[in-house]
Amino acid sequence: MVSENDFEELSKMIQETCRISFENSYPNKWIEYTISRQTIERLKDKANKLHFYVAKEGCEIVGCGAIGDYYGKKDESCLFSFFVKPNMQGKGVGKEIMNKLEKDNYFVRAKKVYVPSSIPAVPFYKKMGYDFKDGKMIFEDGSFLLEKIK
């Protein structure tokens, strides 16, 4: 779980990941807007409302993910803030985080679990058993909503 001492490093890791991972998929304006929302304060707020996990290699944060209710529904949950540092992608970090999230009580009790996804993350989520909600839901910001029905 995330600790009070993690938030500054976590914010920087997420911002770096967005800048690098999204550069070939989204306009710079969208990337900068997304980065501007990854503040220490917002991450602390999420950590107070969700179960928020971090993956570390030694003392360095290399990934994160959170899970909570989907709009207050007890039988539906949602993954949030799922990021893996670019130089650690493809090395099992995302799978490790997903395994933690899928053992969490929010996941265990849910019949459906949703995950909003960026374009580059879709193949990972599909590999983990998630598929597009209602065929292929695309939001105005160019993101997708995937789901896993249990």
Where are each of the predicted segments found?
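A short beta-loop-alpha structural element at the N-terminal edge
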Residues: 1-12
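A short helix-loop-beta-strand connector motif used in the catalytic cores of GNAT acetyltransferases and
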Residues: 38-54, 78
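Conserved beta-strand in the GNAT
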Residues: 54, 60-69, 78, 83
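A conserved beta-turn-beta hairpin within the catalytic core of GNAT-like acetyltransferases
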Residues: 69-80, 89, 108, 139-142
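Conserved acetyl-CoA-binding loop-helix of GNAT-fold acetyltransferases
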Residues: 84, 90-103, 127
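Conserved GNAT acetyl-CoA-binding A-motif
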Residues: 98, 105-118
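Conserved catalytic-core motifs of GNAT/GCN5-like acyltransferases
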Residues: 114-116, 126, 131-147
